[in-house]
From Swiss-Prot:
It holds the Pfam family Toxin_cobra-type. It is found in: Secreted. GO terms for molecular function: toxin activity. Binds with low affinity to muscular (alpha-1-beta-1-delta-epsilon/CHRNA1-CHRNB1-CHRND-CHRNE) and very low affinity to neuronal (alpha-7/CHRNA7) nicotinic acetylcholine receptor (nAChR). This is Weak toxin S4C11. The geographical location for this forest cobra population was Rhodesia. Disulfide bonds join C3-C24, C6-C11, C17-C42, C46-C57, C58-C63. SUPFAM superfamilies: Snake toxin-like. Its main location: secreted. The keyword Disulfide bond applies.
C-alpha cells in the first residue's frame, strides 16, 4: 500500500507503508482551527478522532488525497 504523507492541501509525496499498515489516513479539523493542515500517513488501524477533528481512512493506493 502507498499513502500520501504531507500535510499540505495538495500533496504528492508518496510513502510505502510497512507490513501490517494497510490503511491510509487523513485528518483535519472542523472550522480549520489549525489553518489548512491535513496530516496524512499509514496506519494499522484507523486513528481515533480527537474533539472537533475529522479522520478519514481508506485502503487503496494514494486514496488519502
Amino acid at each position: 500500500l502507498t499513502c500520501l504523507i504531507c500535510p499540505e492541501k495538495y500533496c504528492n509525496k508518496v510513502h510505502t507503508c510497512r507490513n501490517g499498515e494497510n490503511i491510509c489516513f487523513k485528518r483535519f479539523y472542523e472550522g480549520n482551527l489549525l489553518g489548512k493542515r491535513y496530516p496524512r500517513g499509514c496506519a494499522a488501524t484507523c486513528p481515533e478522532a480527537k474533539p472537533r477533528e475529522i479522520v478519514e481512512c481508506c485502503s487503496t493506493d494514494k486514496c488519502n488525497h
